[in-house]
Structure formats: structure tokens, C-alpha cells
């Protein structure tokens, strides 16, 4: 994916994946293997865009502005890119579901570190190992099959994003 080759996006992704944590320039530099001077430049750009803010701690840290609609939008894009790049949807499609729908906080871009990814699959139950996908996306994955869906979840599923097939 083109965006993942952009160092600004790589810095922003740290805040998308761990949106409640305070991050530090040197920590980000180590995680994404980018010079701390470049990280600092990108941090200042993200502050200017209103996606993150400086914390008032002894050491200068930065945290996501999770209420900002632009942060939510960019986070949602990042979530979809991670799902696509993980190949999870391609693996699920091998079981011939009628549709695959992402719903819940991950779909809305409102997920935090402890959130899971809710995916509805219009199919009979099948087994799939999720560990590698969960490791790549940094979230637990919860698959909900058609036969297991109760009435209260139908509304959430109907508001979700179609990743494959149709409603």
C-alpha cells in the first residue's frame, strides 16, 4: 500500500494503533526505524493538523486527539488498510460467504488498544486460525456468523462497512 511507505503515515500509525497511550519521539523512532529528527518533524506536522497534542508531563510526550473527527477518519482508513494488508478478508473469502461486514468500534475508527475487531460473516460457521492476523493488526478478532446473530446485533451489523459481497 502506498500510504504505508510514507514516513508521516508511519508516525501517525503509532497513534492509530495505540490511541490512549502517550508516545515519545525516541520510542516512535525505535519502533518505526526512522531518525528521531524526522520523527520530530512529522510529530510537529501531526500537531499542526490537530491529530495529536503535546502532553504536559516532565518529558515531552504526545497523545492522540481521539475526539477530533479528522483523527477518527484517518484512524478508520488505517484500520481498513491494516485489515486489507493482513489478508484476513482474502482468507475468509475462501469459505464462500455471501458477505463479510466490519462493524463496531473498529469500523467507526473509535477502537482503543483493548478493543476487538467485530466481523459478521454471512455463512455457516467454519474454523479459521486468527492468531497471525491478530498479531499483525494488534487487535483480537471476533467473528460472528449468520446463525449466531441475535436481533440486538443486527442493527450494528447493518450500520457496518461491507468488506465483501452485499447486504
Where in this protein do the model-derived segments appear?
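Catalytic core of pol beta-like nucleotidyltransferases
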Residues: 1-98, 107-113, 122-167
Amino acid at each position: 500500500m502506498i500510504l504505508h511507505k510514507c514516513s508521516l503515515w508511519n508516525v501517525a500509525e503509532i497513534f492509530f494503533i495505540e490511541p490512549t497511550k502517550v508516545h515519545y519521539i525516541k520510542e516512535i523512532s525505535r519502533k518505526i526505524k526512522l531518525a528521531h529528527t524526522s520523527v520530530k518533524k512529522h510529530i510537529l506536522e501531526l500537531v499542526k493538523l490537530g491529530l495529536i497534542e503535546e502532553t504536559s508531563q516532565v518529558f515531552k510526550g504526545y497523545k492522540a486527539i481521539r475526539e477530533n473527527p479528522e483523527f477518527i477518519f484517518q484512524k478508520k482508513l488505517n484500520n481498513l488498510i491494516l485489515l486489507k494488508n493482513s489478508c484476513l478478508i482474502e482468507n475468509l473469502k475462501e469459505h464462500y460467504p455471501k458477505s463479510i461486514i466490519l462493524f463496531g468500534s473498529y469500523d467507526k475508527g473509535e477502537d482503543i488498544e483493548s478493543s476487538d475487531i467485530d466481523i459478521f460473516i454471512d455463512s455457516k460457521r467454519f474454523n479459521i486460525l486468527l492468531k497471525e492476523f491478530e498479531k499483525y493488526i494488534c487487535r483480537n478478532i471476533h467473528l460472528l456468523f449468520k446463525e449466531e446473530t441475535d436481533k440486538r446485533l443486527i442493527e450494528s451489523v447493518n450500520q457496518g462497512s461491507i468488506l465483501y459481497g452485499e447486504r
